[in-house]
Swiss-Prot record:
Xref: SMART domains: KH (SM00322)
SUPFAM superfamilies xref list: Eukaryotic type KH-domain (KH-domain type I)
GO cellular component terms attached to this protein's record: nucleolus; nucleus; small-subunit processome
Region (Disordered): 1-72
Residue intervals of the KH domain: 168-225
Family statement drawn from the similarity comment of this UniProt entry: Belongs to the PNO1 family.
Gene (name only): pno1
Amino acid composition bias (Basic residues), ranges on this chain: 28-37
Protein name: RNA-binding protein PNO1
Subunit structure: Part of the small subunit (SSU) processome, composed of more than 70 proteins and the RNA chaperone small nucleolar RNA (snoRNA) U3.
Compartment(s): Nucleus, Nucleolus
């Protein structure tokens, strides 16, 4: 009898266990559900983007010089020394023609203030034209030929550099005159040689030296002139210039 009761208890226990297993529900992890939702959203977005037409970039028309300046006309004034009045008067047609026709600027010579005044107008297209025109007039006032100064309008990589002989070495009297004579050379030979090798233009105005050219070429010409001021013989300077010229030719 005891064995029969034990077997019935075991059967009821197994029945209870089976009932309990059916009562429990499996809970899915929330992380997996989130990942599945995110993947489904990404798929729908890619389908929508592929089906829709490609987005066009916004097109903004270029502003004119008048609009960039805010409608206010800008002006540059270049003072003219007394010894350059006559050359300015003789070459005035060559000076104002490229400024007015090519750069679309207004220019005049103020007789009261003795200055060349350059001004923008509604026809001005390039905002940097005013600076280039001022550099062009300044180069002519310093003593450069109109044809050489015109390169400042045509080319962007040209610069003007000015320094004094006494900035290199504090010379006075005859020593200063001899230094200037060494830079010029007999009949201007040394100056022309430096100009041709370095592809620059040099103006000697009393103790002032003005160089027109690209940054690298100005550096070469300035080094040669400084060596002459410090007392190097012209033959040595010529040799150094040739070496530098051959090096630069090999690079390019």
């Amino acid at each position: 009898m005891e064995s029969v009761s034990d077997s019935t208890a075991e059967v009821s226990a197994t029945m209870d266990c089976d009932g309990n297993t059916e009562a429990f529900e499996k809970v899915k992890s929330k992380k997996r559900e989130k990942c599945k939702r995110a993947a489904a959203e990404m798929d729908t977005q890619t389908e929508e983007s592929s089906s829709s037409a490609p987005v066009k970039r916004p097109h903004f028309p270029a502003l004119s010089g008048d609009q960039l300046g805010g409608g206010v006309d800008e002006m540059r004034k270049v003072p003219v020394p007394s010894h350059r009045y006559t050359p300015l008067k003789e070459n005035w047609l060559k000076i104002f023609t490229p400024i007015v026709e090519n750069l679309q600027l207004q220019v005049r010579f103020n007789l009261k203030t003795r200055q060349v005044e350059i001004k923008t107008c509604k026809e001005t297209q390039d905002i940097g034209a005013l600076t280039r025109a001022a550099d062009f007039v300044k180069a002519f006032v310093l003593g450069f030929q109109v044809e050489d100064a015109l390169a400042l309008i045509r080319l962007d990589e040209l610069f003007l550099e000015t320094f004094d002989v006494t900035d290199v070495k504090p010379l006075k009297g005859d020593h200063l005159s001899r230094a200037i004579g060494r830079i010029a050379g007999k009949g201007g030979k040394t100056k022309f040689t430096i100009e041709n090798v370095t592809k620059t233009r040099i103006v000697l105005a009393d103790t002032k030296i003005h160089i027109l050219g690209s940054f690298q070429n100005i550096k070469m010409a300035r080094t040669a002139i400084c060596n002459l001021i410090l007392g190097s013989p012209p033959s040595k300077v010529y040799g150094n210039l040739r070496a530098v010229a051959t090096r630069s030719a090999e690079r390019f």
